[in-house]
Curated annotation (Swiss-Prot):
Enzyme class: hydrolase
Main location: membrane
Periplasmic side: 42-266
Descriptive protein name: Signal peptidase I
Biological processes, Gene Ontology terms: signal peptide processing
Pfam assignment, any one: Peptidase_S26
One GO CC annotation: plasma membrane
EC number(s) reported in the record: 3.4.21.89
Family the UniProt entry places it in: Belongs to the peptidase S26 family.
Keywords: Cell inner membrane, Cell membrane, Hydrolase, Membrane, Transmembrane, Transmembrane helix
One Gene Ontology term of the molecular function aspect: serine-type endopeptidase activity
């Protein structure tokens, strides 16, 4: 027979467990909103620095906070501009909301700062009329068997990274549009972005345009997980998800897990 004391202790334990659960959820949400947030990359515009289905960890505090960087509040106009703002640097890989479609997130490399003059001539970036260092260092063959030329580029602040261009047998149709551009004058408060996959990126050269600082969400830091195929799909049903689990596990890219996105030794 259960006494009143036993019932009281049971209720107290249940309340404590529920309180602990709520506390953990609140801490997790605060971390996601203010400190770090994971993202999945669905496209190849940053290939081969970032591949499709790479899972990225990014730091929310790197540039301070705006409506767009505060998860769950990005469509609520809490305030204008940024608070605790920190200036981004050339070469940063940034997650942001594109001005033309606020329902999605883009990830690109920051090339141009406010006040800069940017142009690409024969695939070489010119910043304020000075071309950056660009050296061909080899080739890259994608998982689809497509060949890219691999270049090491160095920005004026010393930041180095790799960019990729379709080999000549693929790239002829892209040369005029992507490799030779108009002159871009970056307005105050806005930034110029490029994808590392230079011939296959919707970036500031074409449809994206300049990105306001307010639209920045986070700075991408490292890859924490990566797969060749996507497992979860709302349209395929439970049975097909189960059948897809084994090939999804087999598609894990072990060599990309915990890869630093700013490491040029790989």
């Amino acid at each position: 027979m259960q006494t009143d004391n036993t019932k009281s202790n049971t209720n107290k334990t249940a309340k404590q467990e529920w309180g602990s659960f709520v506390f953990v959820i609140c801490i997790a949400l605060l971390i996601r909103i203010l400190i770090m947030e994971p993202f999945t990359v669905p496209t190849g515009s940053m290939k081969a620095t970032i591949l499709e289905n790479d899972y990225i960890f990014s730091t929310k505090y790197s540039y301070g906070y705006s409506n767009y960087s505060l998860s769950f509040f990005d469509f609520i106009p809490l305030f204008k501009g940024r608070i605790f703002a920190r200036e981004p640097e050339r070469g940063d890989i940034v997650v942001f909301r594109p001005p033309h479609d606020m329902s999605v997130r883009y990830i690109k490399r920051l090339i141009g700062l406010p006040g800069d003059k940017i142009q690409l001539i024969d695939d070489v970036i010119y910043i304020n009329d000075k071309k950056i260092e660009r050296t061909e260092v080899g080739t890259y063959i994608s998982e689809e068997g497509i060949k890219y030329l691999k270049f090491k580029e160095t920005l004026p602040n010393g930041r180095t990274y790799f960019s990729y261009k379709l080999a000549p047998i693929y790239g002829v149709i892209y040369n005029d549009r992507y490799g030779n551009t108009d002159v871009f004058y970056v307005p105050e408060g806005k930034y110029f972005f490029l994808g590392d996959n230079r011939d296959q990126s919707n970036d500031s050269r074409v449809n994206l345009g300049f990105v306001p600082f307010e639209n920045f969400i986070a700075k991408a830091q490292f890859i924490w997980f990566s797969t060749k195929i996507t497992w979860w799909d709302n349209d395929i049903g439970v049975i097909n998800l189960v059948l897809k689990l084994k090939p999804w596990i087999e598609s894990v890219r072990l060599n990309r897990i915990f890869r630093n996105l700013y490491n040029t030794d790989v």
